[in-house]
């Protein structure tokens, strides 16, 4: 008779290799000026976090002009409020800090969950059905890149 050895099973989880490291190499961190950045946040956007995240993953670690071009051509509904947010952040950078739009670079683009608006829809036989409208907060950080010599 053979005996089996009981061993604790630990599943191996392969880590996904993120493409962000490649994109982050486009502009070395020593060329990003540490305190030369502009924050812009928009709160309570009526959109799912996952839909916004899909668009923000495409624009992170890109220059401003490239970002505007990508957002204009994206077929997602989530790209319009994000485009307005990026425009506003760039306008703040040029108006208040006298930055050049050609040197602006998106270093941080994140989305977080906000409140959920709950409504009830009338159904058959006097019953009601809950509708949950999710909202999100989006934060964009534009950093200025100094010119290489």
From Swiss-Prot:
<keyword id="KW-0689">Ribosomal protein</keyword>
<dbReference type="GO" id="GO:0019843">
    <property type="term" value="F:rRNA binding"/>
</dbReference>
<comment type="subunit">
    <text>Part of the 50S ribosomal subunit.</text>
</comment>
<keyword id="KW-0687">Ribonucleoprotein</keyword>
<dbReference type="InterPro" id="IPR005727">
    <property type="entry name" value="Ribosomal_uL22_bac/chlpt-type"/>
</dbReference>
<dbReference type="Pfam" id="PF00237">
    <property type="entry name" value="Ribosomal_L22"/>
</dbReference>
<dbReference type="InterPro" id="IPR036394">
    <property type="entry name" value="Ribosomal_uL22_sf"/>
</dbReference>
<comment type="similarity">
    <text>Belongs to the universal ribosomal protein uL22 family.</text>
</comment>
<keyword id="KW-0934">Plastid</keyword>
<keyword id="KW-0150">Chloroplast</keyword>
<dbReference type="InterPro" id="IPR001063">
    <property type="entry name" value="Ribosomal_uL22"/>
</dbReference>
<keyword id="KW-0694">RNA-binding</keyword>
<comment type="function">
    <text>This protein binds specifically to 23S rRNA.</text>
</comment>
<protein>
    <recommendedName>
        <fullName>Large ribosomal subunit protein uL22c</fullName>
    </recommendedName>
</protein>
<comment type="function">
    <text>The globular domain of the protein is located near the polypeptide exit tunnel on the outside of the subunit, while an extended beta-hairpin is found that lines the wall of the exit tunnel in the center of the 70S ribosome.</text>
</comment>
<dbReference type="GO" id="GO:0003735">
    <property type="term" value="F:structural constituent of ribosome"/>
</dbReference>
<dbReference type="InterPro" id="IPR018260">
    <property type="entry name" value="Ribosomal_uL22_CS"/>
</dbReference>
<dbReference type="GO" id="GO:0009507">
    <property type="term" value="C:chloroplast"/>
</dbReference>
<dbReference type="GO" id="GO:0015934">
    <property type="term" value="C:large ribosomal subunit"/>
</dbReference>
<keyword id="KW-0699">rRNA-binding</keyword>
<dbReference type="GO" id="GO:0006412">
    <property type="term" value="P:translation"/>
</dbReference>
<dbReference type="InterPro" id="IPR047867">
    <property type="entry name" value="Ribosomal_uL22_bac/org-type"/>
</dbReference>
């Amino acid at each position: 008779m053979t005996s089996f050895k009981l061993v604790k099973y630990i599943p191996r989880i392969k880590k996904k290799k993120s493409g962000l490291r490649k994109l982050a190499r486009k502009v070395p961190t020593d060329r990003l000026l540490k305190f030369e950045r502009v924050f812009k946040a928009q709160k309570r956007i009526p959109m799912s976090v996952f839909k916004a995240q899909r668009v923000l993953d495409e624009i992170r670690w890109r220059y401003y002009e490239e970002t505007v071009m990508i957002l204009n051509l994206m077929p997602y509904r989530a790209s319009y409020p994000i485009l307005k947010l990026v425009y506003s952040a760039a306008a703040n950078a040029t108006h208040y800090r006298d930055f050049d739009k050609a040197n602006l670079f998106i270093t941080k683009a994140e989305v977080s969950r906000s409140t959920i608006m709950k409504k009830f829809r009338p159904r058959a036989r006097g019953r009601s059905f809950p509708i949950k409208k999710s909202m999100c907060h989006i934060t964009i950080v534009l950093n200025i890149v100094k010119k290489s010599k």
